[in-house]
Amino acid sequence: MKKKLPIIIGCCLFVYAAIFVIIMLAAFLLPSYVYGNDKLIASELNSANKIKYRRRVHDGITTVTCDKMTGMDVIWKYNTSEDVAMQMNYTFQVTSGKAKLILIQPDNTSITLTEQDSDAGENDVSDTTSSAEQQCTLNLKRGQNKIKIVCEKGTSFSLSFHIDS
């Protein structure tokens, strides 16, 4: 019995270490895998690594800034009992990296509202990287609708938005 105890303890430690490594790899690798994966973006999963991430709501205006972000985060949720269109006024500036705002409807349909790349040249197809106010229409479906910000590795951005019903 005394010979089996160290083997059992060793096996348990090995299993716990393997589980820990898998969880840590998922926590660090998953956010960088998210950007181009629409199925993951539309899922309930929220996975992001953030440095100096600040979010505040004041007088109906939501402001989100981040020095470095990789992955995705829900920045707005809205439940509606019927299909409705709402206007979103926003300023979005990516100073480093690549980011996009995605509307996720209750049936997990994802719609790209805007996408910016700090490296986009004048001839590249990308939304403007200026901080001028923009506007878009949110076509919300019955149920819970969400807006997520999705960032490639190490993206720095500032976002301010207001949604009118």
Question: Can you annotate each of these PLM segments?
Answer:
Residues 96-117, 164:
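Short, surface-exposed beta-strand/strand-loop-strand elements in extracellular ectodomains
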Residues 113-141:
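Extracellular carbohydrate recognition and processing domains
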Residues 75-86, 137-142:
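Extracellular and analogous surface-interaction loops
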Residues 151-165:
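Edge beta-strands of jelly-roll/beta-sandwich modules across compartments, strongly enriched
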Residues 31-79:
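Transition segment at domain starts
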Residues 145-147:
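A short tyrosine-centered beta-strand micro-motif
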Residues 84-95:
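A short beta-strand element within beta-rich, extracytoplasmic domains
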Residues 10-26:
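Hydrophobic membrane-insertion alpha-helices, especially the h-region
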